[in-house]
Amino acid sequence: MSTIQLEAQSRTDMGKGASRRLRRLENKVPAVIYGGSKKPMAIHFSHNKVIKALETESIYSSVFDITVDGKVEHVILKALQRHPYKPIVLHMDLQRVSSKDILVKLVPVHFINEEQSPGIKAGGIVQHTMTQVEIRCQAKDLPEFIEVDMSKVGMDDVVHLSDLKLPKGVQLTVDVTDGSHDAPVVSIHAAKVSSTELEETPEVPASAVPTTDQGESAE
């Protein structure tokens, strides 16, 4: 579970007009909590605190706590509506979860120890094909991210989905056992010399080649 904690207040005013007033006059973010055995609940957050929380990567893929009128709810972020060009959060949808709920989530992939990779040390170029993967697990087992250790990845090596070391209780949502869905996650390849670079290679003029008295090139 993430260490993120947010405080919210319940609200009774509903509708677009009420939401606009919250945003414009009170600098609040309207939101809704739904799911579980409870009824949906309309709430609002401090906009400044929401903006700060959204700077934390784990809020998008982890279970976190919110306190509503003194009562704690365990939730995941289901939807986030932003202003098209202003740094303003317009609305949030949150889903209640219990520790045994089965969740399907996209979680980020972190590539660690790249500076130790033999392939990179040899001048190879890293290609990150995937930066997030979809997993299935109980809420209590939901990781904030999946790590890929690059310390032993060499030149022309490819790390596939089947190579990922998943935490206990966590599964990929795709079946990689038969190889047909075993997509590459990251690879290292030698840098290619472009045709432009080859064309720009200076030629040695004939006058620069030493010759003998007979006009033949010196060996």
UniProtKB/Swiss-Prot annotation:
One of its GO terms (biological process) is translation. It comes from the Bacteria. The keyword Disulfide bond does not apply. GO terms for cellular component: cytosolic large ribosomal subunit. Residues 193-219 are annotated as: Disordered. Keywords: Ribonucleoprotein, Ribosomal protein, RNA-binding, rRNA-binding. Pfam families: Ribosomal_L25p (PF01386), Ribosomal_TL5_C (PF14693). Belongs to the bacterial ribosomal protein bL25 family. CTC subfamily. Part of the 50S ribosomal subunit; part of the 5S rRNA/L5/L18/L25 subcomplex. Contacts the 5S rRNA. Binds to the 5S rRNA independently of L5 and L18. This is one of the proteins that binds to the 5S RNA in the ribosome where it forms part of the central protuberance. This is Large ribosomal subunit protein bL25. It comes from Legionella pneumophila (strain Corby). The lineage of its organism: Bacteria, Pseudomonadati, Pseudomonadota, Gammaproteobacteria, Legionellales. The gene is rplY.
